[in-house]
Structures are given as C-alpha cells and as structure tokens.
Swiss-Prot record:
Similarity field: Belongs to the disproportionating enzyme family.
Species of origin: Chlamydia trachomatis serovar D (strain ATCC VR-885 / DSM 19411 / UW-3/Cx)
Entry keyword set: Carbohydrate metabolism, Cytoplasm, Glycosyltransferase, Transferase
NCBIfam families: PRK14508.1-4
Single Gene Ontology MF annotation: 4-alpha-glucanotransferase activity
Gene Ontology CC annotations of this record: cytoplasm
Enzyme Commission number(s) from the entry: 2.4.1.25
Name of the protein: 4-alpha-glucanotransferase
Taxon lineage: Bacteria, Pseudomonadati, Chlamydiota, Chlamydiia, Chlamydiales
C-alpha cells in the first residue's frame, strides 16, 4: 500500500492534479443518500432537487464536507436510478413543485399539492402515484407557463441551444415513447425507429418536445441553485455517473452506433454470486466511441459538472472490459486479452479525466484485475473500500487493517447494493464475529450501540482520503430513526426484481434530522 506522501506524488504526476489541488488530500467525511429517499414538509411524494439545500445545511452542521447522491437521470417508468432512459437528462420527478413560479395558477393547485405531499408520509416511495400525479400537474403547469410567456424567455432558448446535443433527441424520444404508451423500443413501429423520418416526427410532436425541454430547463435551474448553495457552504456534492444505459433509452435509439443490443453486460461469478449477474444492459461500442473522440462521454461529464464537484464512476472496470452475456446465456470478458483491455482503458481515461473539472472516484468492487487497479492508481483515480469485504482472500481471509487502505480511496461501511451494517451483522454471524475480533470489540449477535458507534468512528479514521457512509448506517444509532421492518432499510438487492428495491425512504424528514440534537452531536464526535 502506498503512503499518503507517495499518493500525493502520484497525484502531482497525474493529468488531474489541478482538480486534486482544488479538493486537496486532507481527510474528507461525507454521507451518501439517494435523492428519492429524502423529504421535507414541502416535498411532493419523493425527494426533490431543492430538498438538497437543507440537506447540505444538515451535513455541514454535523461536520460532513461531502454529500453523495445516486444518479438523478430520467428513468421513465422504471424506479432504478441505474436504468435511465437518458444518460444526461435529469428526472423531472425530482422537480420541487413548491418553488415553481405561478404554480398556484394550476387548477386546484393547493389541493393537488397537498395530496402529493401526503405521499411523503408513506414508509416507501410510491413511484406510480407520484409519477402520475406529478405528470398531470406538470402538463397543467406548462400551459400556465405558455400563457405567461415563460417559454419565450431568452434563457430557455439559450439553454436549448447550449444543450442541443442531447436535449432535442431526448425530448423527441420522450414524446414518441409516451405516444406509444411507453412501449419498449424493440416494439416500436418502424416509422419511429427509422431516424431518416425524424424531421417529420419533430413537426408532429413539436409541442411535446417543447414541454419536455422546458421541464429539463426547470431541472437545470433547480440543480444549479443547489450547486450554488453547496459552494457557499463549502460542501462538495458527489454525483454518480453510470457507465451503462438502459436498452430502452434515448441514447440507444438515437446514438445507436455506440451500442450493441444483441448481447448484454453483467458481472462474472464471484464469491457472493456463483452464477454471476446479467444486468440486461447493452454493450458500449468502445471503438466507435473512440472514433468520435468520446464525444458522448464528454457531453455527459460536461453537463454533470454543472452540479457536482466529484463523481462516482460506476463499474469503472467497464472502461477496460465488460463481462458479456450472449443470447445463449454464456459469458465472457470483452476484450479478453490484458494488452487490449489495458490499452482501451488507458485511452478512454486519458481523454475523459481532463475533459471535466470533477474529481472521479471509481467503483472498483468485484473482480478487478490487479493491472487495472494499478492503472487507475497511476491516473490518481480513487477506488472503493468496503471494510467487510476487504480481506486477504488469496490467503487466510484476514481482514485488512483500516490503516492499510490505499489513501487514494473512499471507505464506506455499506453500499446501496448491500445490506446495512446492522443487517449484515445479524445476517452473517460468522463474518461479523470475525470482524468484531479483528477490531477488538465484544461480540453479540445483534450489533450493539457501542460497537456500531465504534465501527463508525473507525470508518472515519481509515487511511482513505474519503470516508463516506450511507445515511442508514448513521441513523441506525437511534432505533426510532429507522424502520422496524429491516427490508425497508435496504436500498437494493442486486439481481432481483422486487417491490422493495429503490423505494427506501429516510424515516425522519430533513427538518427532523436538523432538530435532532443528540444525533447531530454524536455524528460530529465521529471525526
């Protein structure tokens, strides 16, 4: 493991040293929470963009410097933030209705807003109701904006021109998709899959295109407001940019030369999943992306840097190679030859890392070749360390001491794809007993408040530069702040289609978090 001084030398020799110099290498503490999980008294059934403003205030008051969120791209009728229908467009579900000018002129606005706000009291996010009620409200609100000439504002036209690379294709795709009742692309009539007929469709759906474009303009306005507040509070927002995209996305429809839908991407068999995983997501054609100088990727990063200071590069190994499933169910690595996948990864990293002002943090969990890890380190790209999984798997299985983590990393006790710390402790008694012995803590079958607090403290004292935990693991210090139903506390169970995936709601409102003096004092004492 390199020392901090060695890591600093790596940083200064890297192409992203200027970005690192802005962030600096002093320890950074943070909290991770999906936006959909948050709510305030004004939220309409789901976490909204402007909810991040009081959330930032809470983070700073507790001593956190980083607020990490999951992807906030438009997911259409899907709830998974990692299965979006656009790699760039934001999800209008997160628009803060209470902040929209002239909202009161929408018919029955007060009653409708109150009904949507009541959905925030449900123990889980109810996407179907929220999506339906917000969609109807936005349609009415758009008509109000048209009457007020807000859609004729020069700023809106400037936004459409600035973002034309992705905005117009997205708005047209959205319009066609809704016209076809959200049919998958492979069931669309050929008239809509034939891109040579786009001009005709643009005329047909002109009003719908402007509607979806205007919603994106509002999303942009609200998220830039969040970023400005974060800057004022010296809080770093860490976004999440997936490598992959839904097969039923605008990108696959419009930029089809960048993707192959005949095979799908997943994960190979490992210690935790003997059969591997098929994510049913299309493969990126890296050669075509390279020929276009990675324009698709660069546009994604350019737009995201309006909102984030750092970003989680999901499944970073995919820049080097994918685990590919063919139609018969057989899997393979592509490219397979280390010489080829290292050359591919080096080329794309050298282009992408300097095209953005954001600091990348790689999600390098799972089966990652050692030569890929070394190359990421040479680019000064941080990796991810999950203490329960950091073990000498090739030897005696001993846990890795917390002070032996690579400084170029982020430590997190749990992820959105794992159980919470308390659930893992209870569900995996053999592992948690070894973990307690490793940490010198007394073992009990249920994670005690003492052990929970000590493990959180230790996670904020690892040798990683970044120490960021799920909000669930902090709130569990107070039983009244979490659900009595354990499955409600888990964000996602990979490889499953479940009504409990991606519906996690933080039990206390942000107002309640802010006023919980005991929790806030305890969190402040962790660092």
């Amino acid at each position: 493991m390199p020392s901090l001084s060695q890591s600093r030398r790596i940083i200064q020799q890297s192409s992203i040293r200027k970005i690192w110099n802005q962030i600096d290498t002093s320890p950074k503490h943070g909290v991770c929470v999906p936006l959909f999980s948050l709510y305030t008294q004004e939220s309409c059934g789901i976490g909204e963009f402007l909810d991040l403003i009081p959330m930032i205030d809470w983070c700073i008051s507790c001593g956190f410097q980083i607020l990490q969120i999951l992807p906030i791209n438009d997911t259409g009728s899907c709830s998974s933030p990692y299965n979006s229908i656009s790699s760039i467009a934001l999800n209008p579900l997160h628009l803060s209705i209470s902040a929209l000018p002239y909202k009161e002129e929408v018919p029955a606005a007060e009653t409708r807003i109150r009904e949507m706000q009541q959905l925030s009291q449900l123990p889980q996010v109810h996407y179907e109701k929220v999506r339906s009620m917000k969609r109807d409200f936005f349609q009415e609100y758009y008509r109000v904006c048209k009457q007020k000439k807000l859609t004729d504002h020069p700023d809106f036209y400037a936004f459409c021109e600035q973002e034309k690379y992705w905005l117009h294709p997205y708005a047209l795709f959205r319009s066609i998709r809704e016209h076809l009742d959200n049919l998958p692309i492979n069931h669309w009539p050929t008239t809509y899959t034939d891109l040579s007929q786009i001009t005709e469709h643009e005329r047909t759906f002109a009003e719908d295109i402007q509607f979806h474009s205007y919603l994106q303009y509002l999303c942009f306005q609200q998220m830039t407001q969040v970023r400005e507040h974060a800057n004022c509070k010296s809080c770093l927002i860490k976004g999440d940019i997936p490598i992959l995209i839904s097969k039923d996305s605008c990108d696959v429809w419009f930029y089809r030369h960048y993707f192959s839908s005949s095979e799908s991407v997943g994960a190979p068999p490992d210690l935790y999943n003997a059969e591997g995983q098929n994510w049913h997501l299309p493969i990126c054609n890296m050669k075509t992306l390279q020929q276009d100088n990675y324009l698709w990727w660069k546009e994604r990063l350019r737009y995201a840097e309006n909102f984030y200071s750092l970003y989680r590069l999901d499944h970073v190994v995919g820049l080097f190679r994918f685990w590919v499933w063919d139609e018969s169910g057989c899997g393979r690595f592509e490219p397979h030859d280390p010489k080829n996948y290292l050359a591919q990864g080096q080329d794309i990293l050298s282009h992408l890392l300097t095209s953005s002002s954001m600091l990348p943090i790689g999600e390098d969990l799972g089966t990652i070749p050692s030569d890929v890890k070394r190359m990421l380190e040479s680019f000064a790209v941080c990796g991810t360390r999950i203490p329960r999984w950091e073990r000498n798997w090739e030897g005696n299985g001993a846990y890795t001491p917390f002070d032996q983590y690579d400084p170029l990393s982020v430590t997190s006790l749990s992820t959105h794809d794992s159980s919470t710390l308390a659930s893992w402790w209870k569900e995996s008694p053999q592992e948690s007993k070894l973990f307690a012995q490793f940490l010198g803590l007394p073992y009990s079958s249920t994670l005690s408040l003492h052990n929970h607090t000590e493990i959180l403290k230790l996670s904020h004292k690892t040798s990683s530069i970044f120490r960021i935990n799920l909000i669930n693991d902090y709130l569990a210090l107070f039983p009244d702040l979490i659900s009595k139903t354990p499955r409600y506390e888990r964000i996602n169970l990979p490889g499953t289609i479940s009504k409990n995936n991606w519906v996690y709601r933080v039990k206390p409102s942000i107002e309640d978090l802010s006023s919980h003096s005991k929790l806030n004092s305890l969190l402040e004492a962790l660092f």
